Amino acid sequence: ARWSSSRLPGKPLKKIGSKPMIQWVYESCKKSNADFTFIATDSEKIRDQVLEFNGQVIMTSIDHKTGTDRIYEAITKIKCHEEDLIINVQGDEPFISHDDINTLIDNYNDDFEMATLYKELKKEDIDDTNAVKINVTGNIATSFSRDFKLSDSIYHHLGIYAYRCEFLNKFVNYEQSENEIRESLEQLRALD
């Protein structure tokens, strides 16, 4: 969870009902079958809020280009093993449920280095550039974009990923692709 969002700075601390967004995300993760839950952040404000609701937090550098790069720093601090499965839930996804997280855990397939979830694309999200779209062929992601033309294989991407620590060690050494930079979507680095 980072403080300096280009679209809405401080987004993880925005209140949804009685709680900050980051607390909703953390609580969904804690309810899942994941063994451990940590918030990785570059912000002392976010850290303080997480500690206030008794969450576990790992401080990271402000220099990371993406959340996945931030996760890499965090897992090096907790001594992740290559075979450990990491579930990366974006800090601004308060409506991802523990059932979504469990679905990703239960269905992770080692034949693929990275996995994610998607759902039907609602009509109101078609032209919304904040709603990331995923193009799927045979249950395999072929591309991601904020601005796809509608077709039968376009869905709404959920901000959650699964990968082994071994893959993450490789991912952070890949150069950012042109598509990743243009779209501001880190998952394109894995596809490209």
Each model region followed by its residue ranges:
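N-terminal glycine-rich phosphate-binding loop and ensuing alpha1 helix
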Residues: A1-T41
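Short, high-confidence coil segments that cap the C-terminus of an alpha-helix
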Residues: A34, E82-E83, D110-M114
